[in-house]
Structures are given as C-alpha cells and as structure tokens.
Regions:
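A short acidic, leucine-rich amphipathic alpha-helix
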Residues: 37-44
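Short helix-capping/hinge SLiMs at alpha-helix to coil transitions
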Residues: 27-33
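Short, amphipathic alpha-helical interaction segments positioned at domain boundaries
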Residues: 83-106
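Exposed, interaction-prone assembly regions rather than primary DNA-binding/catalytic cores
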Residues: 106-129
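Minor-groove-contacting beta-hairpin "wing" of winged helix-turn-helix DNA-binding domains
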Residues: 69-80
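Short amphipathic alpha-helical interaction segments
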Residues: 47-58
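Short alpha-helical segments that sit at the start of domains
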Residues: 1-24
Length: 129
C-alpha cells in the first residue's frame, strides 16, 4: 500500500466531518515535494483559514499525523521520511528555544513601580527652557 492510500484509509476512520475532510485532502500531500499551500487547502476544503489551521493541529495532536511545515518551504505536507521528520522537528525545537528565551526575558523584565508611574514629569517649556 502506498502512503497516500494509507492516509486515505486513516482519514476514513475520523468521525468529525471537518477533520475527516481536511485529513482526506492531506492524504494527497505526502512528502515535502507534494506540499500544499494553506490557501489551496482552504479553498479545496471550503473552510476558513483559522479552522483549517486548527484542524491541522488536531490531526497532529489528537490523531498523531506527522504533518510538517518549516520556514523556507511554503505549505504543509505529511512527513514521508526521517530526513523530513528531523528537519521539521529541529525547526520546532529552535522555535521552542526562542519562545522560551523570550518568555524568560518577559518574566524578568523590570516593570516600573506604581510610584515611578505616578511621579509627575515636569513639562518642558515650548523652547526647552
């Protein structure tokens, strides 16, 4: 059985109609070279972009479908091999590390105390005098 047929059969097992529809459409896009742009997937499924994004997330998290995407390659696809898997996984790890660093900075950032905010700032004259 080829991978497209495998995922087509897996999509038929999904009970939610919208999720099943997106899964069936994705079964035609196995391998990075067969990536589908989000806009094309939205048009094909007749759903909104936010809804399709959420469904793709559901396919990954709830149904454990290996759907890939990464910077430098437009579109989404079902990961077909270990090279694609690790490329996507490493990019996700990099993004995770960036988010973690940003979170730490925000957690530790100095916030002006209420007293600092309540201080009256003298208004400068019209010509800086």
């Amino acid at each position: 059985m080829n991978p497209n047929d495998y995922y087509r059969l897996k999509s038929a097992e999904i009970t939610e109609a919208d999720v099943r529809l997106v899964a069936a459409c994705m079964s035609d896009h196995v391998g990075e070279e067969n990536a589908v742009r989000l806009e094309a997937l939205v048009a094909r499924c007749g759903l909104g972009e936010r809804q399709v994004r959420d469904i793709l997330e559901t396919l990954v998290k709830a149904y454990r479908w290996p759907i890939g995407a990464h910077a430098g390659k437009a579109g989404r696809w079902i990961i077909a091999n270990d090279k694609e898997r690790w490329h996507v996984a490493n990019e996700l790890l990099s993004r995770e590390n960036e988010l973690r660093a940003r979170r730490r900075i925000i957690e530790q950032a100095h916030l002006p105390a209420k007293l600092e905010l309540d201080k009256q700032v003298p208004q400068m004259g019209l010509f800086g005098s």
